[in-house]
UniProtKB/Swiss-Prot annotation:
It is found in: Endoplasmic reticulum membrane. Residues 56-63, 167-177, 255-256, 348-356, 425-436, 533-857 are cytoplasmic. It comes from the Eukaryota. This is Phosphatidylethanolamine N-methyltransferase. The lineage of its organism: Eukaryota, Fungi, Dikarya, Ascomycota, Saccharomycotina. It comes from Clavispora lusitaniae (strain ATCC 42720) (Yeast). Keywords: Endoplasmic reticulum, Lipid biosynthesis, Lipid metabolism, Membrane, Methyltransferase, Phospholipid biosynthesis, Phospholipid metabolism, S-adenosyl-L-methionine, Transferase, Transmembrane, Transmembrane helix. PANTHER family: PHOSPHATIDYLETHANOLAMINE N-METHYLTRANSFERASE. Belongs to the class VI-like SAM-binding methyltransferase superfamily. CHO2 family. Its main location: endoplasmic reticulum. InterPro entries: Phopholipid_MeTrfase (IPR007318), Phosphatid-EA_MeTrfase_fun (IPR016219), SKICH (IPR041611). It catalyses: a 1,2-diacyl-sn-glycero-3-phosphoethanolamine + S-adenosyl-L-methionine = a 1,2-diacyl-sn-glycero-3-phospho-N-methylethanolamine + S-adenosyl-L-homocysteine + H(+). GO terms for molecular function: phosphatidylethanolamine N-methyltransferase activity. Its EC number is 2.1.1.17.
């Protein structure tokens, strides 16, 4: 990087600013010239050691250093925070410099001379104060304030660490087994080294400009966006998040709760500083333009349209007292988490038995939740079961997501409530019936447990903020991409997803782990293990395979920020190439989806076995051959059948003409019936099953024609035969050759422009065979159906024919629901449009990548 960098003030003045040194080099490198302020800072830092020599009581030292640390930490977060806030909102520091003319050569005041001397001493004799804007010079002075406060903050913290470590004759080295002391020192050292690497990497990435909050004073040209490189790809705000793990490493080494509390105190104030000072300024300087912000708000509002335009219940957040499901959720939570354990602890004599009951309840509820949610998602992903049912019953597909959200949230609440209730019972009974696996370090366990619980809450909040309620409730499984804004057409890489592809896989069980750490019993460990296994299965074998199907493997398999940094810094280039996703567009097998592929194959094979007939079509035809009546005086011949490779066939709904021939003076009560071959093949000379009104008299004529149509026909595919019966009885005189009734396939297009052609086919091949009076596509179908004897049965019959002929599943009362909505004005044209819409939704739910692979196969 060039030493000369371009900057621009907020007034629009451009300038070139020279290279500056980092804090450590400036203060502690003896080869670097020290200004007066820098010498004062170094002196003050060294003076901290005087406490060790002037105060003999170590506890007093600890108290003094803790007080000093609190002072400097408050100076950091509230002192520097106040200055930066004023500069960000009002340019107060620059305006004070301008008002006092601190950098004006002609100003000979004491403060002006001190400030100018300091700047000149920092930058060297070649630096021209007047050639640089006031904002840059003010920043140089501000840096010295930062140097003093930050270094004093760190040095006083280290003094607290040392004072606590050497307390009671170097207590950090004894009082524990050797292995535990060694482990503590090693882990603490690793955290410190990692913290050091984070700080160094962050400084190398953002340089002094951002390290000293330079963007509060001026902008660096060609640096308009936030930098996401190095450690900034691994952690959000690494200086304030991972940049403080070293504090906890020092607490481990010092073996001191005092150091731990001080570290937590400092870290907490730093997060307050981030929230109140840094983030507002970052949003103002680097935030998205107003139209993009508005678009994000629109996406969130679009999300609400899938949930009745009201924010859905997530846990117990967004609780709405006017929503029945919320009330039930609250009652369930209070019942399982509070009421049952409290009453049980007071009224139960056998505490151990009750504890086992609560454990079994927690296990059963978690197992039930795992089975139901995973099952629903698998069925929806592979067979679109839920969406198909909603569309088939004329319900908006959006309702499927809303109802699943209620189911999902209710079951999740039940699992957490039963788990919490079990542990509340343990605490109320003071663990009388169960021993802890780990008994020591109670305060450390509570601290780490609460930290894990808070981590899960924060991660879940970030997930909802990044992917919205739509993503939180697996909206990709239920809603096609075309139904949402273009921003939903790709996986989110913002928020926590910038750093981790599946944050819930790592942090989704943190809360349960936290409770287990606080109350480490075997029951909790078993439930925690079950939770982890379910979480792993759901993400890797349910969610991931579906995401690949919808968005493509390349997009799903993109490296997260953490993985990029790990590869870059820890893996050789030769190994990195093995992890790269192929850039070609050819579909490839997914190594992590072998289980799902095997599962799909098993289900498809099972379904084919269950739906295939027990006896083949050819065998049924052979069984029906009329070998028993070769010399009979009676005969049946079927007219108008279409030839096929094995047996002639007709189509469902089309009238069938049967010619009969009988001897003279036969009974006028002879009759002909239509039967399934599979139902009658075991009895040749007598029919033992009912014809269900699919019959007609022959009359006294010796020959004639009987037409079977509408209600006298079967509406199922299969092999059939006609039987000639004698004298109104069930004695068989002749059986016709077998024939097949097939389903006429009607292709439903995906384009609305082809609705008229689809309507014509529906009317010709379905409605004209079932009802009368529907002469065109604009005539309400109720006109024809209302003339039938059983209106409801006709509605259901037509719906069944539509499902079988088009392949688009509709409920048996689909037409009834549509007629009710339109006031009996629903037409064949409307039906065609509705079928196209259903087909389009189901098609889009398959996912672009899945359909592309299917075509190639």
């Amino acid at each position: 990087m060039s030493d000369q960098r371009k900057g621009i003030t907020f007034d629009g003045e451009t300038f070139t600013f020279p290279e500056t040194n980092d804090m450590v080099k400036t203060l502690f490198d003896p080869t670097v010239h020290k200004s007066a302020c820098e010498l004062i800072i170094v002196t003050l830092l060294v003076m901290n050691s005087l406490v060790f020599y002037s105060v003999s009581n170590n506890q007093s030292r600890i108290n003094i250093f803790v007080g000093m640390y609190i002072f400097w930490r408050l100076c950091y977060n509230f002192g520097i925070g106040f200055l930066l806030n004023q500069q960000s909102n009002r340019f107060r520091l620059v305006k004070i410099s301008e008002k006092m003319r601190l950098f004006d050569k002609g100003n000979k005041s004491f403060w002006a001379r001190c400030v100018q001397t300091e700047v000149q001493s920092q930058m060297g004799p070649s630096y021209s104060i007047s050639a640089h804007p006031v904002a840059f010079n003010t920043w140089l002075i501000f840096r010295k304030v930062v140097d003093l406060i930050l270094m004093e903050d760190f040095i006083t913290f280290m003094c607290v660490v040392v004072a606590c470590a050497i307390d009671s004759d170097y207590q950090f080295l004894h009082g524990q087994p050797v292995w535990l002391t060694t482990l503590r020192l090693v882990i603490g050292s690793i955290l410190i080294v990692f913290n050091f690497w984070v700080k160094v990497n962050a400084h190398n990435t953002i340089k002094d400009y951002a390290w000293y909050w330079g963007d509060f004073f001026f902008r660096q040209i060609n640096n308009d966006d936030l930098i996401f490189d190095g450690v900034f790809e691994m952690f959000p705000h690494p200086m304030y998040s991972a940049g403080y793990v070293g504090y906890y490493g020092f607490a481990l080494i010092a073996k001191s709760y005092t150091v731990l509390i001080v570290a937590v105190f400092g870290h907490f104030l730093q997060m307050v500083f981030l929230h109140l000072v840094e983030n507002p300024h970052i949003d103002k300087i680097y935030g998205p333009p107003p139209n993009e912000t508005s678009l994000k708000k629109l996406v969130k509002l679009k999300d609400l349209s899938f949930f009745d335009n009201v924010a859905p219940l997530v846990g117990l957040v967004n609780f709405n007292i006017l929503r029945a499901s919320d009330i039930i959720n609250l009652l369930n939570c209070l019942t399982y988490a509070v009421a049952i354990p409290t009453v049980s602890s007071l009224a139960t004599y056998n505490i151990e038995a009750m504890g086992k009951v609560l454990f079994c309840i927690a296990i059963l509820i978690k197992g039930f939740e795992s089975f139901v949610i995973n099952g629903v998602l698998l069925l929806q992903s592979n067979y679109k079961t839920i969406s198909e049912w909603y569309l088939a019953n004329n319900l908006p597909v959006e309702n499927s997501l809303n109802n699943f959200a209620v189911l999902y949230n209710s079951l999740i609440n039940l699992t957490y409530s039963s788990f919490v209730g079990m542990n509340v019972f343990k605490l109320l009974t003071k663990l009388k019936y169960q021993d802890l696996i780990i008994t020591g370090h109670i305060y450390l366990r509570i601290f780490l447990g609460l930290l894990l619980i808070i981590t899960q809450v924060m991660i879940n909040t970030s997930i909802v903020d990044s992917i919205g309620y739509f993503g939180w409730f697996y909206g990709d499984f239920f809603i096609p991409k075309a139904s949402v804004l273009p921003q939903r057409a790709h996986l989110s890489k913002g928020g926590v997803y910038r750093y981790l592809n599946n944050p819930e896989q790592i942090f989704g069980v943190c809360g349960v782990m936290g409770v287990t750490m606080i109350v480490p019993t075997y029951d909790n460990f078993m439930i925690c293990l079950l939770w982890m296994l379910n979480n792993f299965f759901r993400i890797n074998f349910v969610e991931r395979s579906h995401m690949i199907k919808i968005y493509g493997e390349r997009e799903v398999s993109q490296d997260s920020g953490v993985m990029k940094t790990v590869k870059k810094h820890l893996l050789p280039e030769s190994i990195q190439k093995k992890f790269e996703v192929s850039p070609t567009n050819e579909p490839k097998k997914r190594t992590n989806s072998v289980f799902i592929e095997s599962f799909d194959s098993f289900i498809k094979e099972l379904r084919s076995k269950n739906t295939s007939p027990v006896v083949s079509k050819e065998r049924l035809a052979e069984m029906s051959q009329n070998e028993f009546f070769s010399g009979s005086d009676y005969c049946l011949e079927i007219e108008g059948l279409e030839d096929s490779s094995f047996v002639p066939h007709s189509f469902i709904g089309e009238p069938i003409e049967v010619k009969f021939r009988a001897p003279a003076k036969h009974s006028p009560k002879d009759w002909v019936g239509l039967y399934k071959v599979a139902h009658t093949s075991f009895s040749r000379y007598r029919t033992l099953v009912s014809s269900n009104n699919r019959w007609d008299w022959t009359g006294p004529e010796e020959q004639g024609t009987i037409v079977f149509s509408k209600e006298k026909l079967f509406c199922e595919e299969g092999l059939y035969e006609f039987r000639y019966h004698l004298d109104g009885k069930h004695d068989v005189a002749f059986i016709s050759a077998p024939f097949e009734i097939k389903l006429r396939h009607i292709e439903v297009p995906l384009e609305s422009a082809e609705a008229d052609e689809l309507a014509n086919q529906l009317r010709k091949y379905i409605f004209d065979h079932v009802v009368s009076g529907v002469d065109d596509n604009e005539t309400p179908i109720f006109v024809g159906i209302s003339q039938t004897q059983d209106i409801v049965a006709t509605y259901e019959h037509i719906a069944m024919l539509i499902t079988k002929s088009t392949g688009v599943k509709v409920g048996k009362r689909f037409l009834i629901y549509n007629d009710n909505e339109t006031g009996n004005k629903f037409t064949v044209g409307d039906l065609a449009s509705r079928l196209i819409n259903i087909k389009k939704v189901m098609h889009e739910l398959e996912g672009d990548e899945y359909l592309r692979i299917k075509k190639l196969e």
